[in-house]
């Protein structure tokens, strides 16, 4: 398929009221095209997560090449979260609960430059369950009262890997509690239950109360959408616009392959 044909046919359809879009009219073999890349990047910023169904398992090289539409990518790695350790692609990951992937999070927030996003493709999808959920941080911020918005606009948050033992590289970094997407201009909550340790400058009781409130606020279903994995499924998500979590109840194996899109420093 040539780029011009793809540009005329590509369509985005919402999968939930405030987050996620299903993309049609594009093939995984699509050659890189700057105009198409810009359109996909804009859609990713707008919807937070893009769902693709290619009808067959995406290869490592195809996934990596497709990632170049969204930015510079890291090497491919895979993981499995099933009951049979012999089926692991990457033995570092054995349990969703142990590795906290079933808790809402944005990747890499304890580092100065968290990933911009990621592509996740089904290698061996579960027979039932085991989806990946996404939550819009733009919608979560917009739903707060003006009072809470003003409070959070002026706060910073310490993010740490020290309470997540599966992360080998230990790091802490302070980011704004609210950041802004440069494409849409929307404000985004940048606080998550996995890595956010505390609000800088608050007393312990103040911090605990506010952190609990924000994490419960993010957990409201009206901010969410879910990818239910099947053969040929792939998602691309924006690591600032959405948080994600794995559903830790499923039947069968759950093997996925991931490509990470490199990012810069989040700014308010």
Language-model regions: role of each:
Residues 2-234, 239-268:
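Non-heme Fe(II) oxygenase catalytic core, chiefly the N-lobe of the double-stranded beta-helix
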